[in-house]
Design a protein with these regions (language model features):
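Alpha/propeptide regions of enzymes that mature by internal proteolysis
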Residues: 3, 10-13, 17, 28-400
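Boundary at the C-terminal end of the N-terminal hydrophobic targeting segment
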Residues: 22-27
Length: 400
């Protein structure tokens, strides 16, 4: 349902107050993190990011019928990859700053203890399947860029234009009105020079009116303009991870993404990194991530979580520990952490599972969720370390 400029301003200011300008609120850990880890009612079980919810039924039926765990997980993530309306993966994914879609993916097959990965792939839609092809048909683990694309074509994958008209127009809107990735990052002492966000409704209104004018000139339909503006101001970091466990306690996982919207060409995030965006150990369990890839790489999040479980932590505690390592990298500085978010999806080989996030959600009243199917398909809220909504990096700046 389209939302108005007033709705956008109200929700944005609410997020700023909850995260950017209320240190007391920021310092409070979510009461939800006192919850306990949940356990599947029965095996098999599949867990994934919320954008995989619509694809769980077929994958679960396949898994329950004796299908391979990795094949089941791949069935889930192919759904968003094939959906042009899901702009976080595959076809229709948001492009880099030059308007080119670059995709990343990895997979791990627990029963055979093998892995495959691809990064910076152009013109190939189902990079999750491509990562599995690397796993099955090469002696390598990771292929990137042009080499990965050539390998895909040699293996029978079809080249296709992944940039939809909708994503192209959103990229044009970003190109004309917003910022780029050149300049200091959050871990640079000079990070503040990039932070001059608006905090008053009148300033937001001026900015958004200007962006609406540009959106109209570009040809974005009226009912889609506020959605496009949101994508520009808050660059999506969407991804999908999926882990699947069968009745024999065999487990596998995979992660696929189009990466951070408007990224510098060649940027590779955590999704294709074995041990960051995805990690599976047949003896322990599986974990994956969505959110700020750079921060997850620094803590090797998925590997950290699985190793925590190996040493006796519950899925919930293992995930919270990984989040706290991200917090430690910024010495607990909430002024910078407001620009970071991370969601971990965790499945232990006995069917215990959890989903944890650094912040409640990208909006205060819309918590991060995990999709689960153990005979009953459902969405559950992630357990957050901190209450409040995160913001995107780079921060909002004055429009040109």
């Amino acid at each position: 349902m389209p939302f108005s400029r007033r709705d956008f301003i109200t929700s944005t200011l609410a997020s700023s107050v909850a995260v950017g300008f209320s240190k007391d609120a920021l310092a409070q850990e979510s009461a939800e993190n006192k919850q306990t880890t949940k356990r599947a009612a029965k095996l098999p079980i599949i867990i994934c990011a919320a954008n995989g919810y619509n694809y769980l039924n077929d994958a679960y039926a396949f898994l329950a019928g004796g299908g391979d765990t990795l094949d089941a997980a791949l069935k889930v993530v192919q759904g968003p990859e094939n959906d042009p309306n899901d702009e976080s993966v595959g076809l229709g994914g948001h492009p880099n700053e030059e308007g080119v879609v670059e995709l990343d993916a990895c997979c791990m097959h627990g029963p055979t203890r093998t892995a495959g990965s691809v990064g910076g792939v152009r013109n190939i839609k189902n990079v999750s399947l491509l990562s599995n092809t690397v796993r099955r048909h090469t002696g390598h683990v990771m292929l990137v860029g042009e080499g990965a694309e050539r390998f895909a074509v040699a293996q029978g994958f079809q080249r296709e234009n992944l940039l939809t008209d909708k994503s192209r127009k959103e990229w044009l809107l970003w190109k004309e009105t917003h910022s780029d990735w050149w300049g200091p990052g959050l871990d640079n002492p000079d990070w503040r020079q990039r932070y001059s966000g608006a905090t008053h409704a009148s300033e937001w209104d001026r900015r958004i009116q200007r962006m609406e004018q540009v959106a109209a000139d570009i040809g974005i339909p009226p009912e889609l303009r506020m959605d496009a503006i949101r994508c520009v101001i808050f660059p999506p970091t969407g991804t999908i991870h999926c882990s699947a466990l069968n009745a024999k306690n065999e487990i596998s996982g995979c992660t696929t993404t189009s990466g951070l919207a408007w990224k510098i060409p060649g940027r590779v995030g955590d999704s294709p990194i074995i041990g960051a965006g995805c990690y599976t150990d047949q003896d322990v369990g599986s974990a994956g991530a969505t959110g700020n890839g750079e921060e997850n790489i620094k803590v090797a999040g998925a590997h950290t979580i699985v190793e925590n479980m190996r040493h006796g932590m519950s899925p919930l505690d293992a995930g919270m520990d990984a989040l706290k390592r991200i917090v430690r990298n910024y010495n607990g500085d909430k002024e910078r952490l407001q620009f970071v978010d991370m969601i971990y999806y965790i499945l232990r080989k006995d069917g215990a599972y959890a989903a944890v996030s650094l912040w409640t959600g990208y909006e205060v009243n819309k918590p991060h969720q995990v999709a689960v199917h153990d005979g009953t398909r459902r969405l559950e809220n992630a357990v957050s370390l901190y209450s409040g909504a995160s913001q995107s990096w780079p921060p909002i700046r004055m429009l040109r």
